[in-house]
């Protein structure tokens, strides 16, 4: 059973009252809906055009039935447990409440997939240090690993030799480093947390009308991430 199939079953098991609101898409015949997680600390609502650009690319390149709307739901809300894919980003402190921590762990251990993007592009920045500390508390200090360039996420739809660089890191934003790898946390052989210090959120945050000026569509890697999340 794929991750997407599992979470459709979970959604089907919830009461109609619980499904009312942002995740009602779970019963609307969609294969994918973009869920941004709101957390009480920090700045969760960054890169506001990124979700719509990812959604557009999924519609353009794949045959998935994609909900055209972004859904924002609190990490502390149990309805997030039915989402096939969740997104967290920010620049500032990540300090989960007990309810947020419980849902994050339950979601990932149950087979969920969370993409986490450090908008600072800084491995020593506040977001990076505090988020990694949260992951160590939940999954243990050695749970976060470097993903090799041979990882399936780089071949799930388009072909990549490794994580694509962003214009921001090439131009010296943040820690002035080009980060050669992504990190992740695996549970029972499945990648449950994908963690990036490359600031993909800012890279994909642009007016859709400017996409025609790109030599290469930089949201293709976002398509890979989603397709990987749904297929394993």
Regions found by a protein language model. Give the residues of each.
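N-terminal export signals
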Residues: 5-26
